[in-house]
């Protein structure tokens, strides 16, 4: 029995504590910090003040700006807003009753179509003029192409003639080189033959000198021998 009574007491205390906490929360919710003037003076203090329940008209005044977090400026009274709405309605009614707007939407569409057609008609001669001005360009291109082809043909002919001249000059150079080589070989042969003759004469002279008789006497002796044979 003692245990049950203790549990009952704790439950009642817990309930009392919960009630106190809820009362404190509600009290805190009804308080806010605001700048308040002290009496009739211009002195202002930032302190906790109980929240006064706002009226329906003042709900919009306390809507905070999402970006700045500041209170927005107070909106005009309901009477002023009603007057503004009336003036806007009057203006809209006057615009609707004007003779320009009195025409049906079908007429407006017709006018728009006519204006579009006229603008297209005005733009068509401009396009024709542009096409006429642009048309001579292909003729110029066609005339420029044969000129370019003629220039290319002349260049090819000049290149061919230059190649022929180079071939002729190379052939002449080859002929001249062959002739010079032949002349040099002939000169070498003549020099070698002359050297051989000189060596033969030198050998004969050396033989005569070995015999001790002068060459003139030898010649005379050789000529007298056939005469004696004839006698």
UniProtKB/Swiss-Prot annotation:
Polar residues bias located where? 95-105, 113-146, 158-173, 222-231
Which residue windows does the record flag with biased composition (Low complexity)? Answer: 174-185
* Source taxon at top rank: Eukaryota
Q: Please give the residue ranges the record annotates as the region Disordered.
A: 62-231
Biased segments, Basic residues type: 72-86
Identify the InterPro entries for this entry: BCL7
Compositionally biased spans, kind Basic and acidic residues: 186-199
Q: Which family does it belong to?
A: Belongs to the BCL7 family.
Q: Which PANTHER family match?
A: B-CELL CLL_LYMPHOMA 7 PROTEIN FAMILY MEMBER A, BCL7 RELATED
- What name is this protein filed under? B-cell CLL/lymphoma 7 protein family member A
Question: Which organism does this sequence originate in?
Answer: Xenopus tropicalis
